[in-house]
């Protein structure tokens, strides 16, 4: 069994918060695949289904973000799962909006929901070696702005990339069930248009890079390169005078 936990805060007032992007991903997976109805258990909303032959349990902890580990730990003990069977989906300030990264293990990175889960995973074999799916929401720019930023709603302008990201995660979730994390990340990147790009989102054709003109030189350097070498006589009175003047020896 694979347990996919989306993190967030319960209640309609938090539904569209940046901090709730994990809930949004879980909801989209639920909508696009065949799952049982949501039910309340393990201090969470849960739904079970089968994806690519693997039984999957969706979990949305209702404990509030900072106590997410209580709910997830309870569900894992009930089903006798290990951290290798767990994928946690949550918001990441240090990734630009629309970026996705998956890794196994690591630290909480200042995320209180992950801190709670890490604490509860210490009692399981394998400890904190569960898979973490980080969904980029961007950073407000200053530490003192973070609290209001993560608990603020996504802007309308975010809907285009947000809908695309949620759909791509849900459509390719079978790769998670098969533990094909790198292929999953590549598929999401393609869906988000993250192919060959320069900073600022400008796509670059590798063939164009190969044909790029050489770097321009300053007009002074060009003049020096084009300057003809002086015609210095090799023999005669002038040559003898220059040898004495420049100290040139035969």
From Swiss-Prot:
Any single biological process term in GO: protein quality control for misfolded or incompletely synthesized proteins
Which intervals of the chain are annotated as region Disordered? 192-250
Protein name, per record:
Peptidyl-tRNA hydrolase
Note the NCBIfam families from the entry: pth (TIGR00447)
The alphabetical list of record keywords is:
Cytoplasm, Hydrolase, RNA-binding, tRNA-binding
Species of origin: Brucella suis (strain ATCC 23445 / NCTC 10510)
Catalytic activity as recorded in UniProt: an N-acyl-L-alpha-aminoacyl-tRNA + H2O = an N-acyl-L-amino acid + a tRNA + H(+)
Active site at 19
Q: Which CDD domains match?
A: PTH
Q: Where is this site: Stabilizes the basic form of H active site to accept a proton?
A: 91
Q: How does it assemble?
A: Monomer.
Pfam families the record matches: Pept_tRNA_hydro (PF01195)
Entry function: Hydrolyzes ribosome-free peptidyl-tRNAs (with 1 or more amino acids incorporated), which drop off the ribosome during protein synthesis, or as a result of ribosome stalling.
Its Enzyme Commission number? Answer: 3.1.1.29
Q: Where is this site: Discriminates between blocked and unblocked aminoacyl-tRNA?
A: 9
Major localization class: cytoplasm
Secretion signal, residue range per the UniProt entry: none
Tagged with keyword Hydrolase? yes
Do you know which HAMAP family this protein is assigned to?
Answer: Pept_tRNA_hydro_bact
| Assigned protein family | Belongs to the PTH family.
Give, as one word, the top-level EC class.
Answer: hydrolase
**Where does the record say this protein resides?**
Cytoplasm
One GO term in the molecular function aspect is: tRNA binding
């Amino acid at each position: 069994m694979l347990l996919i936990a989306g993190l967030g805060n319960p209640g309609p007032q938090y539904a569209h918060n940046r901090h709730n992007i994990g809930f949004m991903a879980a909801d989209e997976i639920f909508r696009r695949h065949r799952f049982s109805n949501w039910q309340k258990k393990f201090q969470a909303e849960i739904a079970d289904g089968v994806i690519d032959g693997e039984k999957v349990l969706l979990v949305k902890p209702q404990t509030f973000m900072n106590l997410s580990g209580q709910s997830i730990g309870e569900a894992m003990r009930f089903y006798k799962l290990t951290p290798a069977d767990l994928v946690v989906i949550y918001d990441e300030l240090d990734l630009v909006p629309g970026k996705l990264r998956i890794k196994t293990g690591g630290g909480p990175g200042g995320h209180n929901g992950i801190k709670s889960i890490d604490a509860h995973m210490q009692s399981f074999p394998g400890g904190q070696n569960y898979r973490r799916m980080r969904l980029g929401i961007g950073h407000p720019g200053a530490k003192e702005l973070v609290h209001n930023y993560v608990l603020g709603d996504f802007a309308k302008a975010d809907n285009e990339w947000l809908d695309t990201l949620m759909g791509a995660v849900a459509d390719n979730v079978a790769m998670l069930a098969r533990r094909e994390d790198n292929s999953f990340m590549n598929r999401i990147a393609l869906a988000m248009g993250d192919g060959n790009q320069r900073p600022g989102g400008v796509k670059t054709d590798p063939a164009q890079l190969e044909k790029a003109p050489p770097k321009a030189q300053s007009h002074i350097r060009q003049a020096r390169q084009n300057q003809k070498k002086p015609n210095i006589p090799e023999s005669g009175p002038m040559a003898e005078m220059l040898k004495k003047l420049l100290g040139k020896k035969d």
